[in-house]
């Protein structure tokens, strides 16, 4: 029995609250159960130096956790004077995932920065960040079109992510913290709304997993992501 009584293929309740802050072009509070992340999308004219003159835009991301997002307080990385390896890995993942959602040529020479700040962590913070940031990005792009700065919306479709894993020999979807900490296999999967894979991060924490188990996990992820994308689209219609 899972901690919340969920079935193996069931994601936690997902809530996406748009326009959560007033200054950013896109802002979303995303909740996967008790995991809560504030995602904002900020638009700047211009692109990084390596893209100048190429007529395309750029999407980048930053990720962080509030000191008491976890069970015990973690010092702010700013106080330590540098970002940790985990933080850099996650923010690069978020950026890669969201670049797959956008036609960068159609975006033109704009840079959109996605800031994902974890308010409360209970497993799956990176997958929640990608899911919420995609909705914030959609809102920001809609504003570029509404303001006449773009003729065509460069959004190709929604992107979402979910964690899957093997816990006590059972393949399950959307792990909360107690499951994640006990997982024999832990995997994060990012997909487009039509089920194409953007990224798979998978590790056997204990016993190696089989090819058949990998396919089972990917199937679980696809089903979970289909549900999450439906929630994203419903949020954007409200």
Curated annotation (Swiss-Prot):
Q: Which PROSITE patterns match?
A: RIBONUCLEASE_PH
Listed EC numbers:
2.7.7.56
One GO term (biological process): tRNA processing
Q: Which reaction does it catalyse?
A: tRNA(n+1) + phosphate = tRNA(n) + a ribonucleoside 5'-diphosphate
Gene Ontology MF annotations:
3'-5'-RNA exonuclease activity; tRNA binding; tRNA nucleotidyltransferase activity
Annotated residues that bind phosphate are located at: 86, 124-126
Q: Which UniProt keywords apply?
A: Nucleotidyltransferase, RNA-binding, rRNA processing, Transferase, tRNA processing, tRNA-binding
- Write down the Pfam families for this protein, in alphabetical order: RNase_PH (PF01138), RNase_PH_C (PF03725)
Q: How does it assemble?
A: Homohexameric ring arranged as a trimer of dimers.
Family membership, please give it: Belongs to the RNase PH family.
What role is this protein assigned?
Phosphorolytic 3'-5' exoribonuclease that plays an important role in tRNA 3'-end maturation. Removes nucleotide residues following the 3'-CCA terminus of tRNAs; can also add nucleotides to the ends of RNA molecules by using nucleoside diphosphates as substrates, but this may not be physiologically important. Probably plays a role in initiation of 16S rRNA degradation (leading to ribosome degradation) during starvation.
The name this protein goes by in its record: Ribonuclease PH
**Which gene carries the instructions for this protein?**
rph
